[in-house]
């Protein structure tokens, strides 16, 4: 079922806001706190949110109708980064527990864990929306083959 224009607008606005948040986390945790784990995962979350935004904008402009292979690529990229984010989450959680770090410390691996989960969320959403939009246009492409 195709989303309404309002749903697409809300999804695009949320993706845009989240990409700005991810990029700001990247810069703050790189420059101020010098915590590369949190900076990397925040930056990855920002890039993935931007990618989801591009997916929504291309759907609104009806660009995917002629390029369904691109949606398949977006799906696999989302699946790849889901695996990367999940493994980073497990790694940061293990490091935080074994090093007995505090929850309140901005340099702890627990914060990297949070941003790994947020990156996982955006990677999952990228795969989900690519799959849904591809299914939406697959019906149309079958009809256009005749």
Curated annotation (Swiss-Prot):
It is found in: Endosome membrane; Lysosome membrane; Cytoplasmic vesicle, Phagosome membrane. The chain crosses the membrane at residues 12-32, 40-60, 73-93, 110-130. It comes from the Eukaryota. GO terms for molecular function: heme binding; heme transmembrane transporter activity. Keywords: Cytoplasmic vesicle, Endosome, Lysosome, Membrane, Transmembrane, Transmembrane helix, Transport. Pfam families: HRG. GO terms for cellular component: cytoplasm; endolysosome; endosome membrane; lysosomal membrane; phagolysosome membrane; plasma membrane. It catalyses: heme b(in) = heme b(out). InterPro entries: HRG. A motif (Di-leucine motif) lies at residues 142-143. One of its GO terms (biological process) is heme transport. Belongs to the HRG family. Heme transporter that regulates intracellular heme availability through the endosomal or lysosomal compartment. In macrophages of the reticuloendothelial system, is the heme transporter for heme-iron recycling. Essential for macrophage iron homeostasis, transports heme from the phagolysosome to the cytoplasm during erythrophagocytosis (EP). This is Heme transporter HRG1. It comes from Rattus norvegicus.
